[in-house]
Each structure stands twice: as C-alpha cells, then as structure tokens.
Amino acid sequence: MVDQKKFNERINDLVEEAEEKPVRRAKKEKPNLKESIYSFQPHQLEDWLKENGEKPFRAAQIFDWLYNKRVKTFEEMSNLSKGLRDKLAANFALSTLSTIIKQESKDGTIKFLFQLQDGYSIETVLMRHEYGNSVCVTTQVGCRIGCTFCASTLGGLKRHLLAGEIVEQVVKVQQTLDEVNERVSHIVIMGIGEPFDNYDAMMNFLKVINHEKGLNIGARHITVSTSGIVPKIYQFADEQLQINFAVSLHAPNQEARQKLMPIARAYKLDELMEAVRYYTKKTGRRVSFEYGLMSGENDSVEIAEELSALIKGIKCHVNLIPVNYVPERDYVRTSRSQIFAFEKTLKKNGINVTIRREQGSDIAAACGQLRAQERSEETR
C-alpha cells in the first residue's frame, strides 16, 4: 500500500523545487459538506437503510430514481414513504453541483463549469463522437502534480473531490443529453486533477457508474489516466479491471520528462516503464501513452525514434496530442507537418499511433482552461 502522507510530502517538495514557488496543499480534513447520495454503491446504500430502520430493498428503488428516472428532488421518489424521503433529504444532497457556465462548441462539444457546495469550481466536458457521447470528468479541485504545460495546475490543489461529486458530473451531463434523447456511452477520467492521487474516490466512482443499477457504463468504455504515480499503477493493475488505462508520458527520456513533469523526479522513467510492463502482463490489456507535442521540446523525428525504442515490445498505443495554448505557459503547439512527421516515424517503427482529434477549441474546452479563465476574470 502507498503511504499517502509521505507521497503528498514528496510531490509537494518536488513541485516547489521545480516551480520555485509554494504549492497550495490540499486540505487534510474532509470539507464540511452534505454527503452526496450519488456516493453510494448499492450495497452501501442497503447498509445505510438497515442502520436507519428501513428495508434494504429500497436501495434498488432509490437507484432507479437516481439513474433511470434522474429525478432532481427526493420528493419525486413517489414509491418511497414520506418518512424515508425526509430521512434522505436530511442526510444527503441530491445536487452538489450547480452550473455556472455551459458553453457549446460549433463541433457539438459542451463544456460545463460547475460550482461545488463550498464555492470551488470544476470543469466537465461532453465530447461527441461517431461511436457515442464521451464525458471527461474532473477528480480534484486543481492539481498539485505541476506539469509545466498544463492549465490545471495553475493555482495548485484545493481539495480532492468526493466520489459523489465525480458521479454527479456524469449525471448532470446525462440530464442535458436527456433533452435530445441521447445517452452517455463513454467516460474518460482525464479532467482536472490526478485520478491516482484521489484513488479511493476514483475507485468508488468507477464502481457506481459501471454498476448495472447505476449508470451501467461498460468497463471497456471507461478510461482512466495517470501522470505516473508508480505504486498506484501496481495497485490498479492488481484490481484486474477491464477499464482502459492511459499514462501521460510526454517525453522519452528522464531529463526531458522531469522538465515537463516534476513527478518524474519522484518516480523515474525506468520505474514508470517497469510498472507499465507489470500492468500489461497482469491484466493482458494494452496501455495508451498520452504524448503532448510541443514545438522544439519533444517533437523532433529523433525524439520519435527514442520514443519508439522506449516502448517497443510493450502492448501499447500512442495518442499524439497537439498541446493547447495556455497564456500562463511558454509552450507552443507543434506544426501540423511536424505532427505528421512524428506520427510517420512511430508507424515506421511498428508503433500503433493516432493523432487526437481536436474538439471544443473555440470554447476553451481543454483541461483547466475554462476554470482558469473564470478565476482570472474574478481577480480583475
């Protein structure tokens, strides 16, 4: 098991060294919030009902109201007694997120900025594809990993999200899709924050949305990404889930990676690759390497050759991502011609590779951008 306290201290120290400024630490205590009803797995809700003098079969009825009928008040749960509805309302929140901004791109992408009960804001993105509707969820308010090209780390980490706050992002998006008779078919845990830094809440979220009585989203339609918290990769591999797994790599050698990603100082590239090999061997599943291309930093043909050598023999796929412009960062997006040259080199070396389709650029849909814009406007 990971010593979370030591890990927190280690990453905070490394990010402070890399950024030369203090990192805002997450609150150690849980915020004083009303617990979301969406935090429960069915058996957990059954236990709560029994402890409060109610029949456990009511859990299935409550789940039906939450995930099939998608009610917005406890009063709408008409097959429950008034007494039970009152108990639920007294103990839980049915809505912990309120919509601050909802923007729709010309390509159909919808970006949501939600406000939490304690006033913090988070982002969620609905992306439309030929194969269905994908939701990118956030797992933390801010991020402390400190990647030097990312908008999510601006302002540091405020707190971890609770499982119900992550689930409710998907529910809110589904309520929007209900208006056009569509459904959420895919989930990517690639929004603001490091999912493996909020591991328990992430796992609870996965079990709720994957459950047949929950949102019933198939495991193979869910992808979780990490910046490279090595001990958690081993733990995730041992879970033996059918969920897709991605690693934010962004560089093929230790020196370049730790410049872009301070976490590489805590967990060296060779340690990360060893953990990835363990994952593929343990699960039999491939890993996706997320690779953000930045002009003059990590996009040369020579670096593509180095990347090919690094991952050769691993059951994997490379997802090339042209980085988005972030005003507070100095990196420049790689040219289209260089992106294609990089892709061609990987393919020549037998690497399975795709270029991520850009979506929602006209509404700041990249991770952390809308939240950063809102924070900037608030401080003017």
From Swiss-Prot:
It is found in: Cytoplasm. Disulfide bonds join 136-367. InterPro entries: Aldolase_TIM (IPR013785), Methyltransferase_A (IPR040072), RlmN_N (IPR048641), RNA_MTrfase_RlmN (IPR027492), rRNA_lsu_MTrfase_RlmN/Cfr (IPR004383), rSAM (IPR007197). GO terms for biological process: rRNA base methylation; tRNA methylation. Its cofactor is [4Fe-4S] cluster. It comes from the Bacteria. S-adenosyl-L-methionine binds at residues 193-194, 225, 248-250, 324. The keyword Transferase applies. SUPFAM superfamilies: Radical SAM enzymes (SSF102114). It is an enzyme of class 2 (transferase). It catalyses: adenosine(2503) in 23S rRNA + 2 reduced [2Fe-2S]-[ferredoxin] + 2 S-adenosyl-L-methionine = 2-methyladenosine(2503) in 23S rRNA + 5'-deoxyadenosine + L-methionine + 2 oxidized [2Fe-2S]-[ferredoxin] + S-adenosyl-L-homocysteine; adenosine(37) in tRNA + 2 reduced [2Fe-2S]-[ferredoxin] + 2 S-adenosyl-L-methionine = 2-methyladenosine(37) in tRNA + 5'-deoxyadenosine + L-methionine + 2 oxidized [2Fe-2S]-[ferredoxin] + S-adenosyl-L-homocysteine. The keyword Lipid biosynthesis does not apply. Binds 1 [4Fe-4S] cluster. The cluster is coordinated with 3 cysteines and an exchangeable S-adenosyl-L-methionine. Keywords: 4Fe-4S, Cytoplasm, Disulfide bond, Iron, Iron-sulfur, Metal-binding, Methyltransferase, rRNA processing, S-adenosyl-L-methionine, Transferase, tRNA processing. Residues 129-362 form the Radical SAM core domain. CDD domains: Radical_SAM (cd01335). Its EC number is 2.1.1.192. [4Fe-4S] cluster binds at residues 143, 147, 150. GO terms for cellular component: cytoplasm. Its main location: cytoplasm. Belongs to the radical SAM superfamily. RlmN family. NCBIfam families: rRNA_mod_RlmN (TIGR00048). This is Probable dual-specificity RNA methyltransferase RlmN. The lineage of its organism: Bacteria, Bacillati, Bacillota, Bacilli, Bacillales.
